[in-house]
Amino acid sequence: MKQGFFTIIENKPLTELVYKMVLEGDTSAITNCGQFVDLRLPEKYLRRPISVCDYNETTLTLIYKIVGEGTAIMAKLPLGTRLDVLTGLGNGYDTSLSGDAPVLVGGGVGVPPMFNLAKKLVAEGKHPQVVLGFNTAEEIFLAEDFAALGIPVHIATADGSVGTKGFVTDVLKDLNYTYFYSCGPMPMFKAMEQVMTTSGQYSFEERMGCGFGACMGCTIQTANGYKRVCKDGPVFLREEVFA
């Protein structure tokens, strides 16, 4: 974990409620895909944990959805704003377990961390495919970015406006894969448990207070006792959480 100041160099809407923010600063503490950062926003006491969509040596890309006061403040922050950011939080995904053809599953705001993971898997010479779940066509984001990596992109929309009508599970049941990685809400994970045929990793979106393990506000029950999503996760093996 490292604390530093980052400058907003991009902050724009991708959909009506989903925004892309690019921050410039020292990203050296980020060592794995699937980690998250904690932002201190103006006039807010608690930091806001946001998953990392992508990063390089000098920039950090975050994709966030306006769901409350904090993210509404984020959407209005002008370019040039300096933010206090904790980077390098969480464990991230283990790509050594993926096999040659893993499937990446993202639902809603669980989509962003899948992007950097996909880039890493492609760089390792593997052949991932991605399944993205949204409510409707107007809510789709990042699909073209995934496609630009040269990997298959499957989309499920609840209303059938794009891709498969239904949920990610309606796509997954017809796919072949060696392993899976996922990020999304618990209802999606529970539905996936009915169709997934391999081992895999789930990244949880539990509500966090501190973001680094002190407040115990994001604990979940696992096969090895209670674990903190922010400190012990957010990524857990399938066998740990759905034994």
PLM region descriptions:
Residues 2-81:
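Ferredoxin-reductase
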Residues 234-243:
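Short microdomains enriched in Cys/His and/or Lys/Arg
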Residues 113, 205-234:
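Local cysteine-cluster metal-coordination motifs and their immediate loop/turn environment
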Residues 45-52, 90-97, 230:
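Short, Lys/Arg- and Gly-enriched loop/turn segments at beta-strand edges
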Residues 10, 54, 155-157, 202-204, ...:
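Structural signal for conserved beta-strand scaffold positions within catalytic alpha/beta enzyme cores
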Residues 69-207:
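FNR/FR-type flavoprotein reductase catalytic core
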